[in-house]
Structure formats: structure tokens, C-alpha cells
Amino acid sequence: MMSNMTGSEPLAAQARQLVQAGEWQQAADVLRQLIGEVTGVAAGQLTINRDQYSLNSLNGTVTLDDGRALFFKYHNEEGEDKTIEEYYNAELLRESGFRVDVPVYACGEPGRQILMYTLRHDRRMADICRDIEQQQAWDQEAEIEEAQRRADRDILTHTLPTLKPGLVSAVAAEPVHQLFYHRLISPENPEITAGLGGRVARFYVGKTFRLEDEELEWQTLSNLRWVINGVTYQHSLRQLFTEAGIRLAPAALAGHGVITAHGDAHNANVWYDTSEEIPQLVSFDPAFAGRNIPALLAEIKATFHNIFAHPLWLYEPSRCGELYKVTVMRRGDTLYVDHNWQLTPLRAAFLRDKGEEYWQPLLAQLARRGWLPPHWQRIFRLAMFCCPTLVLDLRAGGFSGHTQTSSALGLAMAMMLGSEPVEDTDEFSDWLAGISPAEQPL
């Protein structure tokens, strides 16, 4: 495997490729070299976590020869070495009062980006939530829900003082767009329509989709209308991707207010800190943090990944068949999908609290300042739509281990988030209506 890599290839990229090839020990050796170079201290025992939540990154633990134990995490995003100058931004979050774990080492060189923290023995919030759901330990839910609610309230408290008008140049420079717009475009191929490039081209365009008993080509599937659990939706997949390529462009978002934010603070990037009498949520790995993040994007990743990605279907697709019954049938230009997915009590509470404690007051403040556009729900929906479709290849047999069941469910979930019902309603539409400022048209 090593013979296929050039000596000039960045160490972080080498480690990522080795892990993908199942060469865990060689990957650990490469990371040990990188960590030794960054810290100036030889790295000893190193363990890479086999982690279902780290979809575009690696993390693990390492013991340095001076006895210190560290937790490391790094991203290996396509194109990041060309676009990110300041990759880690924990200090700017701490300066604004956010609870954030500050790394003891940070390297921002292209292809060598890595964060190292003092090793904690706290658990990640994502793991605690998964255990509650897997064990159906609903008696533990109240404490975790309250911690999340406090965190949502605290995030808003520190966010609102940073709200300001946006400048196109400053907004466009923010790394958060790597999670959305940059995954929709192919700058090297300008003839590709925005929204159908980037990961969309890599994952979906021209590919075959196996959705339970149906097998459809992209050209067909992308133009179908969807009826999900009896609810007819307005858009096709192609329409959602191309609209996202317009509405999520940095210049299109710059006029709607910007804030200081983490940008990717879903619960796999959050510690459940029990060092104080009252448990607190502490974020880490602020790879996409900034001072000019569009206000309508800042908590989208947390809203999707903490709530709609569970249980199992996104992060553990091979287990999807244990929980879900999904049927798919095409009739003419319409795809009918029925499934039994629903929010667990824990995720339903998270959705309610995120709306009440964060989104509702933020949207109201944007409306008062005249920065909330009439089409804000389209921006919100399209960003939510991009979370599952762009973080992983949702095709069965694609790059991410998805099955015919999880693929059908995942695309139906994305459609429900991205498109309004034609006549009926659904849980997400009701939630959006509930957080809407009264003076704003839907």
C-alpha cells in the first residue's frame, strides 16, 4: 500500500488512505511520525478510534514520550489545503465566551492539519445519546436533555452579541462553506451547474441507485416527485441540489447577518463534561469556526446530526434493517416511499429545545434587524438537505456502506427536510412554522 503513495504526499492524507485500505498499523505509524514532528516530542503508543461518527476525519489517543496523554483529531477534506489558512479557531470561540476545549497543539499546514488536546476521560455527548437509545434507558433522558437545553441556551447567549452585518468577502472566506457550498461545486469544471458538482457529481450524478426493490438511474431518479408516508413533496432531487447551489452560495448568504460560531458543533464534537456539579457540554475540534458565519448556517449541522440522523440509519447503515421497514415503488414520474422511522423521545426533545432556546430567538432578532429574508425557510431547508446527502454517499454500494434500506430511508429523509409538502404537513414543517417570527411570511 505504501508503495502507491508518493513521498511528498502529506502524512495526514497518507494515514486516511491507509485506514480506508484497512492498514491500521501503518496508519498509526504515519500518525506517530506526524505527531512527533508537530509536538517536538516522540510519540509512543497510539490508538486510532474506529468511530462511526467521524465521517471525514480520524481521531484517537497517543502517549508522548514525556508521559503526556493526548486526544488527536484531524480532517482530511478534499480541497482543504487550498482554502483554509486558519484551520483551528478555538481561541476565537473562547474569546466570545463559548465553552470550547482548546488544543494544546494545533498544526494548520496544508495536508498536516491536526489538533491535539489533553486527553479527557469524559464521554462524547453522541455516545451517551446512542447508549440511551440502544438500551432504551429513557430514565436517563431527562438529565441529558437538560444538559443539551442549557447548551442551546448558552450558545444563543454568546451568539447574539456577535451578530452583525456581513461583508461578501469576509463571508466567502469562512471555512464553514466547505460543509455546504464547496461540496456542491466543481471549480475546475465551470461548465458543471452549481449544485451538481463536487460531491454530488462524485456520489450521485450518472450513478445507479438501489432503493429496496427499485433500481433507478440518476437521470430518472433525480427528476421524480416524491410521496413519503402519503405526503406529496414539491421538489425533485435535481431541483433541490441546483437550488442549493444558488441559495447556499456565500454571496447569497452574506446579507442575512453573520455571527461568531463553531459551525460544526454536533454532538460527536461535544464532550459531556462532569467536572463541575452541573454537567456541561464542551465543544471541540472547531475546524469550521469563524467570526463571519452566516447566521442561518451556524447551527444547521448540529440541528441535523443531533436529531434527524438517528437512530442508526446514517452512522450505522448496516443495522438499518434491524429497526426499519421501508418500501419503495415507482409509478410513472413519482416515487412512493413508506417507512416507520420516527424521532425517539430524546431526539424529539432535542428538536423542541433547539427551536425554543436557539432558533426562535435568533430568527426573531434577524427579523427585527431586517436581515431575515422572505425565503429564509428555503435556505434553512436546503442546508438541512445537504447534511445527509453531502456528508456521505447515500447510495447502496457507494463509498459509505449504505444499504438498499438505509439509502431509501436517507434520501426520503433528505427530501422531507429539503422540500415543502404540496398540501399536507409533516413534523419538520410543523416545527419550522413554530419557530417562524410572526411578521415573516412563510
Describe the role of every protein-language-model region.
Residues 56-84:
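ATP-binding glycine-rich loop module of kinase domains
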Residues 73-112, 139-151:
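A conserved alpha-helical element in kinase catalytic cores
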Residues 128-262, 273-279:
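ATP-dependent phospho-/nucleotidyl transfer catalytic cores
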Residues 344-442:
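ATP/Mg2+ or Mg2+-diphosphate-binding catalytic cores
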